[in-house]
């Protein structure tokens, strides 16, 4: 989720930890990528980030690829469908790098999906709480 990418980047920046993390987001499907060009952040998601003074300008969708598995220590999907897609694209998870974001809050539930609810603030709150717990687990 680009929302998670930029919320987490904002958190680490505020703690002066930007140099300690590489944070990016990738799609698990091609729905937001046309002719090899990714769409920008969905306008309502961009709007909710802007309301929280978080800038996501310039971000475009890219799809996760198998080579990403070796590049990152953790891969953090937003929901169970993302977990399945990531496992398929990455050909499994032998090093146990895939963890749903909400698992860091002690919950097994998915991040509220604004595609179905239209509630981008609830989605933001889920992601914020998940990112906060994730960061606390790492520092």
Regions found by a protein language model. Give the residues of each.
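Conserved active-site segments centered on acidic
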Residues: 1-71, 136-139
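A structural signal for well-ordered alpha-helical scaffolds and beta->alpha junctions
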Residues: 38-42, 79, 131
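Phosphate-binding/catalytic loops
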Residues: 68, 74, 80-139
